[in-house]
Amino acid sequence: MSPIGFNAKTGASGQVEKRLRAQGIELPEPSKPGADYVPFVRMGELLFLTGQLSQWNGERKFIGKVGREVSVDQARQAAKLCALNLLAHLRVALDGDLDRVLQCVRVGGFVNAAPDFADHSKVINGASELFLTVFGDAGKHTRVAVGVNGLPYNVSVEVEALFAVRG
């Protein structure tokens, strides 16, 4: 059984990169691990990506608790930024060929939330929507969106992902 949205490749390469350019989407430089871990691990067809923070080329963005210092709209942008960082690491893991993605399997989103904040899902939509834009049906995924009391460097959002890949 094929994954949801799986399309047999026609031999054309760079389709995902073309989609990125057509949408005006630029990827940041992949960040270096900030502690004793690796940015990704591959097990067979599964590629596990380490959680990425809301930063652009090393500069942290959207600092603070969502629902207090950071608005829902800003936090959605933070989640999208996390997803862009995930794509940058995914590109490295796949030797530059994002067309090797079969499916975005799972997204995990963590929101540095004020105690009374309850719109975690709206925040993580920023990441989910980017994966759908970039991969089409292959960007459909399962997901968890949870509120946490804090994140590294007090960023507002962290997102991790699991992809099925070929080759």
Stretch-by-stretch model annotation:
Residues 2-167:
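Short, polar/acidic, helix-capping and beta-turn segments at strand->helix junctions
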